[in-house]
Amino acid sequence: MLFSKEEYKNRLKKVQKSMQEKGIELLISQDTNNMNYLTGYDAWSFYYTQCVIVHVNAEEPLCFVRAQDAGGAYIKTYLKRENIIIYEEKYIHTWPMHPYDPLIELIKKNKWEKLNIGVEMDSHYFTAYCYEKLKQGLPNA
């Protein structure tokens, strides 16, 4: 890690404070810079679906990555192993499956599907298709 665990915790608290001020209960961050800022994750696999999920009251964010990139997340982040969420490679380029399918299931499993969710609409790899998958998969969010 380039920074201390305490530094990352302070960054998380700042983001959560901003989320509270904006009424956001769950943040899905796909921007690689923001993912790195929050966790230290810096893999050069940004062209595949990956994100950091921040619950407004969580002690740690979740890092959602493909199986092949999990090793980098274990090494480069301060996160506990259980907060690195791995999706299977079968979701990559196998339409109609998409990596947001297990992301949506993760959100439902944690009972977050009715929360006010914030996303980065100007993030380079957060496509209109990703946005539509979230809207369709989480209609009550």
Task: Show which residues each predicted segment covers.
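A composition/biophysics-driven feature that prefers long, compositionally simple stretches
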Residues: M1-A141
